[in-house]
Amino acid sequence: MINNLSKPFKWFFKLEAASGLVLLISAIIALIISNSYLSELYFNTLEQYLFIGINDFGLKLSVHHWINDLLMAIFFFFVTLEIKREFIQGELSNLKKALLPIIGAVGGMLVPALVYIVINFGDIETLNGWAIPSATDIAFSLGILSLLGSRVPISLKIFLTALAIIDDLGAILIIAFFYSGDLSLSYLSLVLISYIFLVILNKSGVKKFIPYLIIGAFMWFFTYKSGIHATIAGVLLASTIPHKVKGKDFSLLIKLEHAISPYVAFMIMPIFAFANAGVSLEGLSLLSLLQPVPLGILLGLFVGKQVGVMIFSFVAVKTGMAQMPDNSSWLNLYGVSVLTGIGFTMSLFVGNLAFAENIQYIDGVKIGVLAGSLLSTLFGYFILLFSSKK
């Protein structure tokens, strides 16, 4: 059964795995540059302002904000296409198949958040970062898994992919409900009107992307102005892309997913990693990691993630609610649970939102995310390597 299930998945896995390695290279380059004589150029370039628009209709944002607000909206558009496809015909379309990654993902979001809250309890400012260690970087985690090749059952790769996709859905909901600014009812109304037009296009059977793109571009602008984070526009747009097919033709959703995936994997996410992973390590010591923000993130990712995913998955299997992935052991599953602690790009993104008004914590976020993700990478890899030899 796994062989049949994995056919549409293998292309996606290879793409995400390769993307993870590119992300790693981008992050390393950012760290090297931000700690070299080019550091001033690096940070100043990210803070340069660019105006995009016509006359008074447009936005003037820093390079850093264009990356985090526009490029990440495209990323979330792509992620939502994946989620929609998975719920319609993929690993999440059958409740019995979906329960294990769903339950594991819930544990992987709740426990890290709890760990962070315990460490930062009593500080209202730093508590705002509670969601940072709840995210999983799907590309990076699958990239590490790919290094083990056939030694890891395909069922575990599917489990990790499904769990990370559900994690992304959780991140989308967290951004929408917890990290939005002061809301403008007038712009929210325009967002709603735009969305209604998109739904009408869907219901009318429009299968060309251009009409969706034009309305979606306006909706992104209205969303940014409304106070809701602009990435939510990508989510709303993707939710209206039709997935119905006639004959042997692919749906618009499938066509778009395949068309933009290389750009997301090898351009958008590496650019995001390069722009957000740079942090000065000058004066960094063990005491830096023991500050509440980086420590909460580090332990949330490295301890909270593996404990949450593993315990929730264990209970789900033992109570008969869900089934173990085919041809896998508990040690296999534990290794994958550890890899979910690779938060990297998603954790950095949530961190930027959480401390948008308190930027003094951003360096601590980067240190905690990088340290927690690195520990999860090394420990998870060696656990899986050891389990494959038994």
Residue spans of the language-model regions?
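Predominantly late transmembrane helices and immediately cytosolic-facing juxtamembrane segments
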Residues: 1-15, 204, 208-218, 222, ...
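C-terminal ends of transmembrane helices
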Residues: 6-10, 78-93, 142-153, 196-207, ...
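Hydrophobic core segments of alpha-helical transmembrane domains in multi-pass membrane transport
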Residues: 23-34, 75-81, 111-113, 194-200, ...
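Transmembrane alpha-helix boundary signature
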Residues: 33-44, 61-64, 78-93, 112-131
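Hydrophobic transmembrane alpha-helices of secondary-active transporters
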Residues: 56, 60-61, 65-89, 239-241, ...
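Structural signature of hydrophobic alpha-helical transmembrane segments
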Residues: 64-76, 124-139, 180-193, 229-237, ...
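Entry/N-cap segments of selected transmembrane alpha helices
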Residues: 87-113, 184-193, 281-307, 330-334, ...
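Functional cores that coordinate and move charged inorganic groups
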Residues: 145, 149-242
